[in-house]
Amino acid sequence: KGSVYNVDPNKKMLEQGKKRFKNLDNISWHIGHAENLKFKSNLFDYYTISFGLRNTKDISKSLKEAHRVLKPGGRFLCLEFSKISNSNLNFLYKNYSKIIPKVGKFIVGKSEPYEYLIKSIDKFINQNQLVELMNKNGFENCKYRDLSGGIVSIHSGWKV
């Protein structure tokens, strides 16, 4: 049975995770940022980040830190929103994205978090640019796989 170290800069998110996974005793919870992890080097077999890399202040620094804390032979996996190559799907997605803040305001009374979400997705780098950054920051055998027509992608790389 392995251990899971969950890191998030948002205390409320960690509290939600603790509630959801209260029956698991192999998870530790840490407030922190991907750019400055408080773990020793060469510690982890896997490093995963989901829908968080685009929210970091410095993507390269975050990738360097991920590489640092991975053991040699460790694998980096990143699930993130990406760029859609199919023009028809992209057209539909862009128009759907315009209504997300309105729906958010209707459901939760706030549109700002959803406006931020759409802007952060729009300004995030594309799949090939992320592969390039992963390579520049020490990862090898980097690749990605589009899911849901490219709305999201899983990026993978190894510390050799």
Question: What does each model-identified segment do?
Answer:
Residues K83-L133, N137, K143:
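C-terminal alpha-helical "lid/dimerization" subdomain adjacent to the S-adenosyl-L-methionine
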Residues V4, F76-L77, N141:
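A short hydrophobic/small-residue beta-strand
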Residues K1-L37:
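Class I SAM-dependent methyltransferase SAM/SAH-binding core
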Residues S60-R75:
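A short glycine-rich, Lys/Arg-flanked "PGG" loop and its adjoining helix->strand segment in the class I
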Residues V131, N135-V160:
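Core SAM-dependent methyltransferase catalytic element
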Residues D8-P9, D58, F81:
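Short beta->alpha hinge that forms the Motif I/post-I loop of the SAM-binding pocket
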Residues E35-Y47:
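A short acidic, Gly/Pro-enriched loop at the edge of an enzyme's catalytic core
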Residues D45-I59:
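A short SAM/SAH-binding and catalytic strip from SAM-dependent methyltransferases
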